[in-house]
């Protein structure tokens, strides 16, 4: 999702949240500025749906709950005044119950595109790691089968690259193990062709 400056004037977090409730286009918010988000491709939507379905099945009857694209993540204000829309998040804290955002998610998934990859890998990776409850940040390529998992480890973070249809994404904290071919099911890549630019 590309970030496009909305206005030169800064707005407060409360003004941003109020505006998002009636906006036709979603915006992410960073330090007083709202940025319009570009639409997502069909493969982006398929990957998001596949992740959400796997999470929903794995978490049925459990405390944790998955949310897709319209649930924001609030970054701790000590780091930045920011609200992001991840593609998928998992929240496990029942007291984290604001209507439009979560402050203490356990997992965050972003499907990468050429327009968003730099922001997802840098800015958002740094911001999400400031959330003490985050166990993993999962970055999913959409034009080839590859997933990068940034996991909280002592001391710091570990990065794991998964490639190929037979590779498995393992998230033991929520009891999920899924083959990458399931994540890419019905996509251009799964049909054997590279996604068009």
Where are these regions (language model features)?
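Gly/Pro/Ser/Thr-rich low-complexity, intrinsically disordered segments predominantly at protein N-termini
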Residues: 1-197
